[in-house]
């Protein structure tokens, strides 16, 4: 694709900043738990062979039909997840002032959201959802638990945020 140099020059001549802009973002929040399914153990901790592919995992699950199976999931790390927090972080990176209202933990903010909640002066509505992401060489299989998000409604937003503060946040957002 060819882009005319005049267009490139005009775009480059325009300052791009969102530093003077304010936004309100919500409403979800997920703790992403990244795990490796264990194929064979060789010792404690991370001494194991992981299930390599989604097809191999599918075969293990299919082989358990009519029986039972226990597949160990080795925890690799946890991180912030959810469409709202990811979008809010992107807007923060562009210099916007962001307030976040969403599922970050209750009564305490979940540790994966502490820095984010501080940067956004977040109002947490409920516990976050949980995504357990099984990582393979050929992709991820994400298993989501969204039950806690069923607690999010307008009445809860007003209760946790305060009606006056919520109206003020919305009124002053760009």
Enumerate the predicted regions with their spans:
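Glycine-centered loop/turn motif at secondary-structure junctions
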Residues: 95, 116-117, 138
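Charged interaction/catalytic cores of defense and host-pathogen modules
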Residues: 105-107, 166
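Glycine-rich phosphate/diphosphate-binding loops that line cofactor/substrate pockets in enzymes
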Residues: 14-19, 166-174
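Glycine-rich phosphate/adenosyl-contacting loop at the front of the ribokinase-like
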Residues: 1-99, 108-111, 131-133, 143, ...
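Conserved phosphate-binding/catalytic loop of the ribokinase/pfkB sugar-kinase fold
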Residues: 123-172
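Short acidic (Asp/Glu) patches
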Residues: 82, 115-119, 128
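Active-site-proximal loop->helix
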Residues: 107-123
């Amino acid at each position: 694709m060819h882009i005319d140099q005049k267009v490139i020059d005009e775009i480059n001549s325009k300052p791009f900043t969102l530093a003077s802009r304010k936004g309100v973002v919500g409403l979800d929040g997920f703790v992403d738990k990244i795990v490796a399914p264990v194929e064979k153990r060789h010792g404690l901790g991370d001494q194991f062979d992981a299930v390599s592919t989604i097809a191999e995992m599918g075969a293990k699950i299919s082989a358990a039909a009519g029986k039972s199976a226990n597949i160990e999931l080795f925890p690799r790390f946890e991180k912030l997840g959810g469409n709202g927090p990811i979008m809010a972080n992107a807007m923060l990176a562009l210099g916007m002032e962001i307030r976040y209202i969403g599922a970050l933990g209750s009564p305490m903010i979940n540790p994966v959201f502490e820095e984010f909640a501080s940067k956004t002066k977040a109002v947490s509505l409920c516990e976050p959802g949980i995504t357990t992401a099984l990582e393979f060489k050929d992709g991820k299989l994400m298993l989501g638990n969204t039950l806690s998000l069923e607690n999010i409604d307008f009445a809860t937003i007003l209760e946790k945020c305060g009606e006056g503060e919520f109206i003020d946040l919305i009124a002053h957002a760009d």
